Amino acid sequence: DCHSTDLQRNYDAATDRYKTTFAEMNVACEACHGPGSNHVEWARNPTPGTAADPHHGLVMALDERKGAAWIPVPETGNARRSPSLAGHRTLAACAQCHARRAPLVAGMDHQRDLFDTHELSLLEAGRYFDDGQQREEVYNVGSFLQSRMHAAGVTCTDCHDPHSGKLRLAGNQVCSQCHAPA
């Protein structure tokens, strides 16, 4: 369900077969932002009521970085978020695929909290190399949830461009946004 948008397995117990369907092959807008019909309507008919919609018709706007800045704290050499993080929508959107998890319900409901629809795995022995790098695929949300960075309000999109998956800055520059060089 992470390599296709709106994947439905549709197991048929009578025939012991799956009738799998999907909306789009690969990750598309709706995988993270939810159903797009309201967004399409917003774009087609920009009436005064819809033009003012700050979320542009998206179910999940994922705009937690908007208006946020990382302010250096001289005493620690690190930075703190200002204003503090108001929610975890971005993390939940990323965790749909970037977490070891087991679904508790069928399908993805963008209106519900991911932690109510999935059981997330946390740190387990053998999953990481001694230097902290992952041994397997990019299932890193469980460890991120237990990190100091998460506790400080860092989100996935502070470091990663959500549309490309690449780091926002090259090399150590991404870390230097918040951490002063030693």
State the predicted function of each range.
Residues 1-3:
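An acidic-aromatic substrate-binding cleft motif
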Residues 6-158, 162-182:
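Primarily the internal scaffold of c-type cytochrome electron-transfer domains
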